[in-house]
Amino acid sequence: MLYFAFGSNLNPAQMAQRCPGHVVVGLAVLREHKLVFPLTSSDWGGGVAGVHVAHGSSVWGIVYDLTDEHVAALDRYEGFRAPGDDHNLYERERVWVELTRPDDGSIPRRVRAEYYVPRVTNPSPPSRRYLDAIIEGARHHHLPDEYLAALGRIPTID
């Protein structure tokens, strides 16, 4: 499965722990969306990342190629049981993203990838620890400087 990560799953240490052996396909951008923090996590002590439609905005991230085992592990971490399950914290949806620096020239510029969408909203600013995990991943994957700067301006709960 192609998976578009834009939150803490950008962080290489977190992804290595959750999905050992995952494959990075490339840097990608989701157009006409913005990064938001629509769900509060007790594990992270604040809001966790999601995206909302927003004209003129973009969300940067990474596309990973995940095995079925990786997907099952990520589903557990993200609170996804099965499509439409009332106990899901998130649903998985598919979205078109643009690969800006694919690792392999044979990969199409636009790909359809899955991402996690919160089922309910309980917005909160992120914790400093959570935002730092995103920023560390964004730096590791060389997301654009202006996007890194925007991440650094996000207010935190602490």
Predicted stretch roles:
Residues 1-158:
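Glycine-aromatic micro-motifs
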